Amino acid sequence: MSRVAKNPVKLPAGVEVKFAGQQLSVKGAKGTLELNVHSSVEIVQEAGELRFAARNGDQQTRAMAGTTRALVNNMVQGVSQGFERKLQLVGVGYKAQAKGTVLNLALGFSHPVDYELPEGITAETPSQTDILIKGIDKQLVGQVAAEIRDFRPPEPYKGKGVRYADEVVRRKEAKKK
């Protein structure tokens, strides 16, 4: 059995889990998420927790059980607490402004960059150089943060660009004559 799949997922108060065939639905205070479970993974709900097991013992099936357990754990955490990712803009004139479902970015280009936020994701700008991306789907929050960072990734000489708040940018020294 996968070492990840051995650990059960604890269901906090206020989180409901429903099975319909291979469709798993997790409902909580912040919303609902759904997942198509692979047919080789067996899920058992007992005493406020979910247990995962592979239907047969081959390597790929055991790996799929561990992956499913990790995805369901992220879903449970998302509908109960939510996820957030913080980005920082470093550079002269770099600004961000959230307007509803659009994030307006000034990143040193000759034009402003307007990023349309997908459904289920919100963005806040506590200051002009900080962006806070929030949502219940961990994969989608990370994907949106990566797409925003890709507009202007941090460069190694001056460190200018869009970076994650916890990211360490390796700096290079300029070439000398």
Swiss-Prot record:
GO terms for molecular function: rRNA binding; structural constituent of ribosome. Gene3D superfamilies: Ribosomal protein L6, alpha-beta domain. GO terms for biological process: cytoplasmic translation. Belongs to the universal ribosomal protein uL6 family. This protein binds to the 23S rRNA, and is important in its secondary structure. It is located near the subunit interface in the base of the L7/L12 stalk, and near the tRNA binding site of the peptidyltransferase center. NCBIfam families: L6_bact. This is Large ribosomal subunit protein uL6.
